[in-house]
Amino acid sequence: MKKKIELLETYLSLYINHHEVLEDMEKDGNKYKVIDVRNAPKKVKKDKIKNSIEIPAKELKEQLDTLSKDYIYVVYDWTGGTILGKVALLELLKNDFEAYELAGALEGWKGMNLPLEEV
């Protein structure tokens, strides 16, 4: 049972909730940088989280040198059930970036009517 609890605690530690990210956005936006890692053309995406940067998961490894380690990165994809966010998070963590996956992904953000912008 202890191993299951430890595994679940580790799993949950990889996520950040919407409210924490939104609070930073409403202040000065200097703590977190949100990355949209969806591998889709703009016409398919249509919108994204306000002020997020777009780096498709398939291109993230090649663009790591454009990211500063002064920020905490929050990655998201379409829904919490897809793996792009997890793949991107793994890449960031393997390269010593502080990073989290957004709990609920874009679907959860939209469901709470939080700030979006067109792509």
Q: At which residue positions do the language-model features occur?
A:
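Flexible, polar/low-complexity N-terminal or interdomain linker segments that lie immediately upstream
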Residues: 1-45, 118-119
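Short acidic-hydrophobic, aromatic-tinged amphipathic segments that line or gate anion-handling sites
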Residues: 16, 55-56
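Conserved beta-strand scaffold positions in the cores of enzyme catalytic domains, especially
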Residues: 34, 52-54, 99-101
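Short loop/helix-cap segments at secondary-structure boundaries that form the rim of catalytic
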Residues: 43-50, 65-67
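Short, hinge-like loop/turn segments at secondary-structure boundaries
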Residues: 51-53, 116-119
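Alpha-helical scaffolding within the catalytic cores
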Residues: 57-64
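Catalytic cysteine-centered active loop of the rhodanese-like fold, especially the PTP/DSP P-loop
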Residues: 64-110
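Short secondary-structure transition/capping segments
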Residues: 111-115
